[in-house]
Amino acid sequence: MSDDETLADVRIVLIGDEGCGKTSLVMSLLEDEWVDAVPRRLDRVLIPADVTPENVTTSIVDLSIKEEDENWIVSEIRQANVICVVYSVTDESTVDGIQTKWLPLIRQSFGEYHETPVILVGNKSDGTANNTDKILPIMEANTEVETCVECSARTMKNVSEIFYYAQKAVIYPTRPLYDADTKQLTDRARKALIRVFKICDRDNDGYLSDTELNDFQKLCFGIPLTSTALEDVKRAVSDGCPDGVANDSLMLAGFLYLHLLFIERGRHETTWAVLRKFGYETSLKLSEDYLYPRITIPVGCSTELSPEGVQFVSALFEKYDEDKDGCLSPSELQNLFSVCPVPVITKDNILALETNQRGWLTYNGYMAYWNMTTLINLTQTFEQLAYLGFPVGRSGPGRAGNTLDSIRVTRERKKDLENHGTDRKVFQCLVVGAKDAGKTVFMQSLAGRGMADVAQIGRRHSPFVINRVRVKEESKYLLLREVDVLSPQDALGSGETSADVVAFLYDISNPDSFAFCATVYQKYFYRTKTPCVMIATKVEREEVDQRWEVPPEEFCRQFELPKPIKFSTGNIGQSSSPIFEQLAMMAVYPHLRRVFYLNDSNLLSKITFGAAIVALAGFLVLKNL
């Protein structure tokens, strides 16, 4: 294929018996008149986009069986977007050749079940000859045949229409949308249009009201429908689909039927305009650019929901919280994410989030989910937001945008340290500890779950827990991430060592528990700028001496760490525990590490930032903010 041809949006290949007028058709198209002297075969022709009705660059290839070997012919056919099989209406043998030679050759090239459209072109129709009785059975028996056009290169009859239909067959193909055998929408098309309907059903009542229909019309086509046009649409649907209209609104069945009507009436471009507005490619899959927009995240930066992203996901919650109880029941949650290809929030990963006593996702837990995913798995956030309909309508007519507007890239941490402040909302805390140190109980407490809840959690559960905490009268998200290491010699990944704060948990009743924490700290976090704190668990039990060079308190003094914090029974299940507030404060203000060291951790956790702050710790914090 030539370099110029690789730029073509549509590649049309003409095949057919010798003498059918393939070359004459191309010459008549180029010259806009009949040409008496034509070559045996033309080289490839490239037609610029600005002279085509659909504004697409088009390549036309004139194949000659006699002049080329079969392998080359097959190779050329395989590169085609659409194939025109040319026959002569004055020669019935060329009609027979469609079934005996050309369609089999096309299937040999693409495989028995292919989706490359085929157009039958009956040339030399300037006389009285008519082959309709033979052509119609061919079209009915071969679903890849999109249409048949009779034309005349001599009189210019339908010459430009042939190539227009060929372009349309590629740009607005029928087969992905319509099953010619069942005369119904394909499963892929139904699934895509159901997603479109659910996104446009703003109030989630199962209907498209006149307002929602008009919003849909303006979004996809740039102009509103008149009241008369709206009534005509609903009347046409009611006539053919009794269940399509109710309460003077369009139901899902009616919406699907409306697009079936468009396709059956040859208005495929209408349905394709809708589908492409909502991100679909010809394969009826969402485009990669739509799902995964390119983004560069500098080292030291993180990603969070932007105000637009927060507004979008918050509105989704309101839309699908049908009983307005501030929670999403399993059915409401399933309904919200029904347009996504795979389950989003499962029984396992819901343990990372706040739920009510029935295990239903609260609004707080729902928003925490999006903040967690955006921080640790941005690709997943992009994908899910795209399926859910963000940012349809933001990028102009005929195209879906991308999800970049849904997120913001935070400032580099190094600059935050230099400026003694940050505008970040989400912070990650690494939770490190030996087996049975109480990590699961500690982490689940952030989600408000007590011992009885933890007892029901299986061994395989999410290594994350996230919730909102208050820091200096601001709402932040603290994401706890458990480090799954069996021994302190196990290596930590770069993602694990780049946390905002680290909590080392040790069991005061296990003499070997602290050694695990001390070893990991010295190996990975000593002399780094990451704030760290030791947390003593199971403090109601009898404390034993730890098998380490020095006791935990002395270890913290030597390494200028805050004194160990006690995680007691009273903290279990308390998402508002001062311990979580202190971890968040250390993450938000890492430049205050020495303040945390100089002062008692329990005192510091109780500090209230306001107009008047007492004690030395308050003075030091104010001085360094």
Curated annotation (Swiss-Prot):
Its main location: mitochondrion. The gene is miro-1. It is an enzyme of class 3 (hydrolase). It is found in: Mitochondrion outer membrane. Belongs to the mitochondrial Rho GTPase family. InterPro entries: EF-hand-dom_pair, EF_Hand_1_Ca_BS, EF_hand_assoc_1, EF_hand_assoc_2, EF_hand_dom, Miro, Miro-EF-hand_domain, MIRO_dom. It holds the Pfam family EF_assoc_2. Disulfide bonds: none annotated. GO terms for molecular function: calcium ion binding; GTP binding; GTPase activity. This is Mitochondrial Rho GTPase 1. Ca(2+) 2 binds at residues 321, 323, 325, 327, 332. It comes from Caenorhabditis elegans. Residues 1-601 are cytoplasmic. Disruption phenotype: RNAi-mediated knockdown results in a hyper-connected mitochondrial network in body wall muscle cells. The chain crosses the membrane at residues 602-622. Residues 3-170, 420-625 form the Miro domain. GO terms for biological process: cellular homeostasis; mitochondrial outer membrane permeabilization; mitochondrion organization; mitochondrion transport along microtubule. Its EC number is 3.6.5.-. It is a single-pass type IV membrane protein. Mitochondrial GTPase involved in mitochondrial trafficking. Probably involved in control of anterograde transport of mitochondria and their subcellular distribution. Plays a role in maintaining mitochondrial morphology. GTP 2 binds at residues 433-440, 470-474, 537-540. Ca(2+) 1 binds at residues 201, 203, 205, 207, 212. Residues 188-223, 308-343 form the EF-hand domain. Residues 623-625 are mitochondrial intermembrane.
